[in-house]
A protein has these predicted regions:
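Beta-rich nucleic-acid/ligand-interaction surfaces
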Residues: 101-109, 222-226, 257-260
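Conserved catalytic core of two-metal-ion nucleotidyltransferases
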Residues: 188, 192, 245-277
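Short amphipathic alpha-helices in soluble, non-transmembrane regions
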Residues: 234-242
Length: 495
């Protein structure tokens, strides 16, 4: 990996809200972004420039729970990738063989891929289960939302980064959240994952912990020993260590292996039926932030299914008693048989909005695009309660594989209308360079108001398909509203 652009591009599709507005600027306007950030925003003598307070967004979690985070604008997103990339050597590997963490760092010049890190974690986990009689598993409740700005900044300084980078990072953390000290860390981007993983090394380094082995995948801890009392004492100690940083354990995800096995022994009828069709051992105990697709990739799972198996899996997807984790697993098994999913896709979209990214992945492989478009439009016109994350990924699905279908105008405008309360989902539609169906007029309205927000920025990016003279004329007025507007306009003009 030669530079920050490659780092950003490698991570782009894995993020929660990948907007092309940011990608286009970082790919095509890096030098200008760099100058603005380091010569103006981070120049103590130019106090009129600063990082903007960032847009709150909500990704989904199972059972209608929401994951609150922020979507960084192009300038802020460039900075966090740049500062972490330049300081990537400060992020080290495991403390020792007895205290191991996995992934979220660079190795041989490349950011370690999630599925590779998880494969190593899973390999150690399986070996240690055989070696020790007991293990205790737990994770941190709302980890990224609970991180305290000053704790993270002090930690970053302690990594012996340059004094200026330490100051710059502190300014970034403070300004993107309007000075609020918690709930500032962006979710779902690799630099944040590197920070979150490395920050917890103070637990790994604590010599008061006596468990024979401790392994950690981000904030998911597993302690191993042949003595339950050792595990319990360490568990109490770790809670106190985490408490010193305002962090708490999630009680619902805390289990001792014997308790876990007891719960696992009483499986739902759907789960039992699934296991009768496909061996699923080990594919349902995910740690935080690891999707089934990553886990399957880590285990190089590639099953050739018979027609009978495909039909059985589709019938399970239709079962009203199916749990989300089982539906997720079945979708991953059927990823190479995506055309078969069209008959159940509407039901999946309705019951499991949290699976929209998995639906996006499998839908890309569907060959009958017109039928897929009809299914999506019918869903969009239903009484379903649409969430921001769902609408965003439906917009991305339309952009990435349905631009040539006959229903493209209806799909785009319906997603845009349903996203009325969701700026980032609307921005997804506005940045698509299609100028029919009223989208051009909507964009021009945003550009003429003098506003400087996601609706205006994505509208400017969406103009890149216009004739040069008309495009540049409209961008000239937009560019005068703010420095970020000017940067975006100057980037689009040279595309």
């Amino acid at each position: 990996m030669s530079n920050v652009i490659e780092f950003y591009k490698q991570d782009f599709s894995s993020t929660l809200f990948p907007l092309n507005t940011n990608l286009i600027l970082i790919e095509n306007h890096l030098e200008e972004l760099n100058k603005y950030v380091y010569e103006k925003i981070l120049n103590s003598e130019m106090t009129e420039h600063s990082f903007l307070s960032q847009q709150k967004v909500y990704a989904t979690k199972p059972k209608n729970h929401l994951r609150r985070t922020i979507k960084l604008d192009p300038i802020a997103e460039f900075f966090i990738y740049d500062v972490i990339y330049r300081n990537r050597t400060k992020f080290r590997g495991a403390v020792s063989e007895e205290r191991k963490c996995f992934g979220f760092k660079f190795k041989d010049g490349e950011a370690i891929k999630l599925h590779e890190a998880y494969a190593n974690f899973k390999s150690d986990l399986n070996s240690l289960k055989e070696e020790f009689s007991y293990y205790l598993k737990f994770d941190i409740a709302s980890y990224f939302n609970s991180l305290y700005h000053h704790d993270v900044c002090h930690w970053f300084t302690s990594k012996q980064v340059g004094e200026t980078d330490s100051i710059f990072f502190g300014q970034f953390c403070r300004e993107i959240n309007s000075g609020r000290s918690v709930d500032f860390m962006p979710h779902g981007i690799y630099p944040s994952k590197m920070i979150g993983n490395e920050f917890l090394k103070y637990i790994d380094l604590n010599h008061e912990l006596k468990s024979s082995k401790i392994i950690r995948f981000m904030d998911d801890f597993i302690l191993f020993d042949n003595d339950q009392n050792v595990l319990k004492k360490d568990f109490i100690k770790i809670q106190k260590l985490l408490g010193s940083k305002g962090l708490n354990i999630n009680p619902a995800k805390t289990s001792l292996n014997s308790e876990y096995q007891e719960v696992s022994s009483t499986l739902s009828t759907v789960k039992q039926a699934l296991m009768a069709v496909i061996p699923t051992d080990g594919l349902n105990n995910l740690v935080s932030g690891v999707e089934v697709s990553d886990q399957q990739h880590s285990e190089q799972t590639a099953l050739a299914l018979s027609e009978v198996q495909i039909e059985q899996l589709l019938n399970l997807l239709k079962d009203n008693q199916i749990e989300e984790e089982d539906a997720d697993l079945i979708l991953s098994f059927l990823k190479n048989y995506s055309d078969n999913l069209l008959i159940v896709l509407a039901e999946i979209l309705k019951k499991f909005p949290n699976l929209i990214k998995q639906v996006y992945s499998v839908s890309l492989r569907i060959t009958d695009k017109e039928l897929l478009a009809n299914v999506l439009l019918e869903h969009l016109e239903s009484e379903h309660l649409f969430l921001e994350y769902e609408l965003f990924w439906l917009g991305k699905l339309v952009e990435d594989c349905l631009l040539d279908v006959s229903l493209i105008g209806k799909l785009l405008m319906k997603i845009y209308e349903l996203s009325n309360s969701y700026k980032i989902a609307q921005a997804k539609i506005l940045e698509i360079p299609i100028n029919n169906f009223g989208l051009k007029e909507i964009r021009l309205d945003f550009l003429k108001t003098g506003q400087s927000d996601w609706l205006a920025w994505s509208s400017a990016i969406g103009l890149r398909g216009l004739a040069v003279a008309e495009r540049n004329y409209n961008l000239d007025y937009f560019s005068k509203a703010s420095p970020i507007n000017f940067l975006i306009a100057s980037c689009v003009k040279k595309l």
